[in-house]
Amino acid sequence: MSGWDEGAVYYSDQPQFPEAGDAATISPHAVLTKFKEFIRNFEIEQNCFPYREALLDNPKRLVVHLEDLLSFDSDLPSLIRSAPADYLPVFEKAAGEVLTGLKMREANEGGVMEEPLTRDVQILLTSREDPVSMRLLGAQYISKLVKISGISIAASRVKAKATYVFLVCKNCKKTREVPCRPGLGGAIVPRSCDNIPQPGEEPCPLDPWMVVPDRSQYVDQQTLKLQENPEDVPTGELPRNMLLSVDRHLVQTIVPGTRLTVMGIYSIFQASSSSNSHKGAVAIRQPYIRVVGLEDTNEASSRGPANFTPDEEEEFKKFADSQDVYKNICTKIAPSIFGHEDVKRAAACLLFGGSRKSLPDGVKLRGDINVLLLGDPSTAKSQFLKFVEKTAPIAVYTSGKGSSAAGLTASVIRDSSTREFYLEGGAMVLADGGVVCIDEFDKMRPEDRVAIHEAMEQQTISIAKAGITTVLNSRTSVLAAANPPSGRYDDLKTAQDNIDLQTTILSRFDLIFIVKDIRKYSQDKEIASHIIRVHASANKFSDENTDSKEDNWLKRYIQYCRARCHPRLSKDAAENLQRKYVTIRMDMKRRAHETGEAAPIPITVRQLEAIVRLSESLAKMRLSHEATPDDVDKAFKLFDTSTMDAARSGINQQINITGEMANEIKQAETQIKRRMGIGARLSERRLIEDLARMGMNDSMVRRALLIMHQRGEVEYQRERRSIVRKA
């Protein structure tokens, strides 16, 4: 037996780390040492150690730039990129040991003796490299470090994720700790107990381990859903989603609607299935990203990205200093559309926007401009919406008939696997910092239209559903297009009949355009010539790359102006605006007194703020930090040709009513009251047809209904299709 005990024992260090090229010869201890040296000794300039100082300022987390790691040691970034799940814990251990050493040095210098503590530090990675498209992530990226970008559309509640599970054997009471896989992975509990039974003792059965939750170790964990940026989605395809897992200090830092750049480990997990019928799919795994670094790129909060080249900035400043900047920008707005110069000016103001302000008492005033295009079909309203969606840095396009209140604001979704509720942002949330284009605005149900009242003025969306109470940001401009109730704008009807929208929603629009299809020989000839020329020259003389470069230049210039310029009104401009606003109010009061009816579009303090925003957007176009009286004059002119024209429309029709017309209207009122009892409901079309058989004039019947509606005697329902007698 002694022969078995003789001889030397040889051993080798064989770590369970994957090979990473030339770095395969590096031992775990050497990697740990290199990470510690990097945190201690990396310096930007003489005696400036950023990571050492950052660790002392915030001992819970340390943000590391991979470019700094590469300049310090070329092997470390390749190790982290190839096997981040193995080397990140080593990095965090190194950070904890460095922090402990720094704290002990501080304590010794201060003459205070402290017991050294093992500190947990979360390492967060960031890089200046370009993100990978979500559509290109495949099997070759599994367990590798990737960088993607998108919009967070949903966030779950915070859960407790076990890092170590404490187990107790039910038979012999032996204990052990089992580590859990990070992310969405679980713990691998052994099937048998490794305790050797004494003679006469009964051996431990199969699956004897029992989890003790109170003695296990936990961290906070949250799951997010990331969606592709709208501008990255190919035409005609649905946006892709990716599940994200964040833990520890990244929890509850992101709300739906935030634009993110994510650095993480592309991982897989087995999704739980409610049925056991999919036995053949045992090898199928669902991808997700375990986040190891988050960067908020939302332009509304970070004031836009600073990734403008010096050449671009010089070009933008040169353009801003040129003559007629306002005119040059308006010529770049929808050049394929003939005419509609005022609408193009409004679209330019909407794209640049005003300045968002925060008052000392915490109240925030919106800087985004809302525009409504109301008018006849075939007047290029939808074309304007499409152009703005393509040109705005952030934009979401939707149609009124296919949009619900939840789809526009936010919805509460129940997770099919965990059965818990989580928030999913709608169009107004996803377009935070950009533009929402809503076509067929008049086709929306009134209750859905009411849902965006708060989003249009306060620029927040309050949610109180299924136990979730929160406020989401929706700092967006709204560009809406609508048709009158009868399909076309009828000059024989009053403005109240043509603009069938509530006063509450109309007052939230800064500019309201009534776009009419005017039949004029010379104008029709020019429009026809322009459209034929556009169709004939499409893809013939113009290069698509040239058009895309022009659009991209305008988008970049808008982005630059919104990020770098936040103008305010000058003193002279403020006095000029005050005089003009008082004049408008007195003019509307005089007209209402003459006609005896209220204006269809109210002129309130919101319209005063609208002119302020328009003036600021005009100053922003030329990168000026001060809006001048000339800007106020241009803004007032645009406001006068849009909202004021709409408010004045139809009023003069009520002035010159002859005695004969008054008698006919009175007779029509009498017949309507005789035909409908109090509380009765009747179709407007049927009522007009019935009275027409009695010899009543259609226009007089409509005028009588309008007067009774203003007095509160009848009420329109179901989009003005039916009438209910109230009194």
Curated annotation (Swiss-Prot):
Q: Which GO terms describe its molecular function?
A: ATP binding; ATP hydrolysis activity; DNA replication origin binding; helicase activity
Could you name the Gene Ontology cellular component terms for this entry? cytoplasm; MCM complex; nucleus; THO complex
Under the heading Gene3D superfamilies, the entry gives: 2.20.28.10, mini-chromosome maintenance (MCM) complex, chain A, domain 1 (3.30.1640.10), Nucleic acid-binding proteins (2.40.50.140), P-loop containing nucleotide triphosphate hydrolases (3.40.50.300)
One Gene Ontology term of the biological-process aspect is: DNA replication initiation
Task: Tell me, in one coarse class, where this protein mainly resides.
Answer: nucleus
- Report the EC code(s) recorded for this entry: 3.6.4.12
Record motif Arginine finger, residues: 507-510
Record localization: Nucleus; Cytoplasm
The subunit structure is: Component of the minichromosome maintenance (MCM) complex, a heterotetramer composed of MCM2, MCM3, MCM4, MCM5, MCM6 and MCM7. Interacts with EGT1.
Query: What is the recorded name of this protein?
Result: DNA replication licensing factor MCM5
User: Origin organism of this chain?
Assistant: Arabidopsis thaliana
Q: Which gene encodes it?
A: MCM5
